[in-house]
Amino acid sequence: MPASMKDRVAIVTGGTRGIGLATARSLLDRGATVCITGRSTEQLADALTQLDAGERAIGVAGHAAEAAHQDATVARVMAEFGSVDVLVNGVGINPYYGSTSDLPEDVAIKMFRTNVLAALAWFTRCEQAWMGEHGGSVVNLSSAGAYRGGPLLGSYGITKAAMIRLTEQLALEKAPRRIRVNAVAPGTVRTKFAAQFWEGNEEAAAAAYPLGRAGEPEDVAEAIAFLASDDASWITGQTLAIDGGLLLTTLVDSLA
């Protein structure tokens, strides 16, 4: 039986849909109290309705890369629940498809700010508010694209590779404070974010994977919940590939 997360409080950024929403549900199923974030108040309300967890789930609207939103979210969680034991950095953007050498500078800055620097900022706030004195667990969302290049997603993959390195560094630095930091690296998952890689082309997308299918949000969510829980109490600084065997192959075009 999975370790109980009763009395644990988690923040899941980007928790209104896809992997983030499935992660919130998995953490709730283990007994945790969860705060999800998202940019749209309507999507937050819909997600909370789907989670149907009453007072054990709240939502805070805002842009994940903005300091004011980060401060407001952590402050509300501390005020309402008294701790921040788990942080899941689930937010990521990919506004550019094409050659990395043609990546506009402003787009590159936006990607790194959201995909990498925001994760560090969320970590810092959670550490200052609670984890620095009490320990905790952080799970970052990377990508199988961090390990291999491709014709369209190279720039996105670079940010996700940086996420892996950030995970390792924070894990090393914060281990004495009993803060574990890990990451997951999914392949193509059937979410709106990755729709162009599977929607309307599901048979071909599935064929790219040795296990014969693209991923589901729950595949990733359950791994995140495991890493966040005491079941993984002696695991830190690791990145778990959740990719249906894709990284065992030489295929790169379908990495998401």
Q: What role is predicted for each listed range?
A:
Residues 143:
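Residue(s) in the substrate-gating loop at a strand-loop-helix junction
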Residues 123, 159, 167:
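Active-site helix of classical SDR
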Residues 101-120, 139, 163, 211:
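Catalytic Tyr-X3-Lys loop
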Residues 175, 180, 235-237:
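Short, small/polar-rich loop/turn modules that mediate ligand/substrate recognition or access, typified
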Residues 128, 172-173, 233:
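Alpha-helical segment proximal to the catalytic Tyr-Lys
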Residues 94-97, 225, 236-256:
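Short C-terminal tail/terminal secondary-structure segment
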Residues 16-18:
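Conserved glycine-rich cofactor-binding loop
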Residues 71, 94-109, 132, 152-155, ...:
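Conserved mid-core segment of classical short-chain dehydrogenase/reductases
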